[in-house]
Amino acid sequence: MRNNFVPIILSFIIFLTPSIAEQEPSILSPVDQLLNKTSSYLDFSTKFNQPRIELTTSTIIAGLLSFLASSISSAGGIGGGGLYVPIMTIVAGLDLKTASSFSAFMVTGGSIANVGCNLFVRNPKSGGKTLIDFDLALLLEPCMLLGVSIGVICNLVFPNWLITSLFAVFLAWSTLKTFGNGLYYWRLESEMVKIRESNRIEEDDEEDKIESLKLPLLEDYQRPKRFPWIKLGVLVIIWLSYFAVYLLRGNKYGEGIISIEPCGNAYWLISSSQIPLTLFFTLWICFSDNVQSQQQSDYHVSVKDVEDLRSNDGARSNKCMFPVMALLAGVLGGVFGIGGGMLISPLLLQVGIAPEVTAATCSFMVLFSSTMSAIQYLLLGMEHTGTASIFAVICFVASLVGLKVVQKVITEYGRASIIVFSVGIVMALSIVLMTSYGALDVWNDYVSGRYMGFKLPC
């Protein structure tokens, strides 16, 4: 009886197993589908395995020019997208939209190197804090990220003639402001050099001893400054909030975490949710007393410090202007892949922020906006991602080289205005190259009879 009972139990288990197996997928199906959709949507390995651009002479020349452009642009922390786009279009022979997506990757690579270096550099004029002004970054970043989203859509909708015209107008204004600020800082530095020389002649041995006693006290006063991890965490939360919106929305093919119709009502509803998100973060930061910090040190009183104090007080009274400018900068960054630093940098210089702090803060903000722009290009079906990553590595190395050279020059000659002039030179070259190429592109469209009006984003 026992021998007959064992086969009956085994046959019952075998019969029951398929029914259990059929029930398990019904329980795990929603979770499995969500995980599969997320993994397939974020599976960039297939994009990186796309056929790369052939290694030709023009590609090598484009890489060398990109290295030179990144090393120059890294001094001002502006990203260099205004130079990358003409290089990739004129030299490498890419179309404007592909060049813009490449530029977003290249700006990201250079910004990573910039931020990595500036995080460990202390500003002696602000009590030993980092060169990056996290208060300004908090105030500007939400609107800049919203502008990037708008700019990417505008890149698909606007005709080439309108994009070229807007770029030329805004960049011309920024260039004039930058060179004006550069001349101002140059004259101010010249006056400070004369003051130091006159003081050096009048100093006697007793004053030298007093100064030698003061310096250790200053160093001890600056040491307790700690890294603002909370502010950095808030910036990361802001970035992740916008990234979550992009994951929910999906790309133009309707591929995302949730299944929605491409360019349907749900698509635009999720996209428009960035507006209240931006308003929430911006208003909270604007009216929060915690975002204000005293940047000046009581031990550094000079003509330049008085001017900076006066300018910073005016900037705080008109701080609502910063989000508007950040929005415009983000729009241009999304359209051209320039990171937005070319407009933010003249703004910060205009209100009296030191060139070193301006460059460091701009590179930090450009990192956030350029990574968001690069991710959006990926989600919109960007091609040749592997080649774009190679150019990003080139810009990363070039930025490290450029930063070291500029820091050595500033330390030796004491001319921080070199940073401002480098920004102006990059802007001027960008205007000439981008406007010339854009005008030729518009002329070719006109001669060939192509459609030169607005297009649908999808």
Swiss-Prot record:
InterPro entries: TM_pro_TauE-like (IPR002781). Keywords: Membrane, Transmembrane, Transmembrane helix, Transport. GO terms for cellular component: membrane. The chain crosses the membrane at residues 5-25, 53-73, 74-94, 101-121, 128-148, 150-170, 227-247, 267-287, 324-344, 348-368, 386-406, 418-438. It is found in: Membrane. It holds the Pfam family TauE. It is a multi-pass membrane protein. It comes from the Eukaryota. Its main location: membrane. Belongs to the 4-toluene sulfonate uptake permease (TSUP) (TC 2.A.102) family. This is Sulfite exporter TauE/SafE family protein 2. It comes from Arabidopsis thaliana (Mouse-ear cress). The lineage of its organism: Eukaryota, Viridiplantae, Streptophyta, Embryophyta, Tracheophyta.
